[in-house]
């Protein structure tokens, strides 16, 4: 059951299924009306540096859509790529992809890397190999050099901004609740 829809149904003295049908009719209309205010990759400033990270927005558990299952998070959801400025302001959110899509593939499919110079932007280890500024992985059975450790520390001191932006996004119930 959808508690929000049940509450709306009680307030308007109609059934929950009626509310569900009304929501289903108006959702695409609202999305179309708001589309002009949704920034796309092409709207990003080509001269600005961005911090990129991916997040999983949980969704209902569809047994007939196994591609929504994220092995990393052990739940179903959609993969969103998020970009923020160095001042910590949300700049862009990608269209959703299935939860089983790796961040590197998701950022490639979003068009971000084609629209902007990848070498300017900061990401986590999930984006290694895409030309972005990323931390260095520790070699198997080895240690990082001191310069790599300092480099990783510098990158991670900046990356906290995108983590805060994503945490702020997820305060919206629809982006953190499995419904």
Mark where each language-model region is:
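Short, well-ordered secondary-structure "scaffold" segments embedded in the functional core
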Residues: 2-179
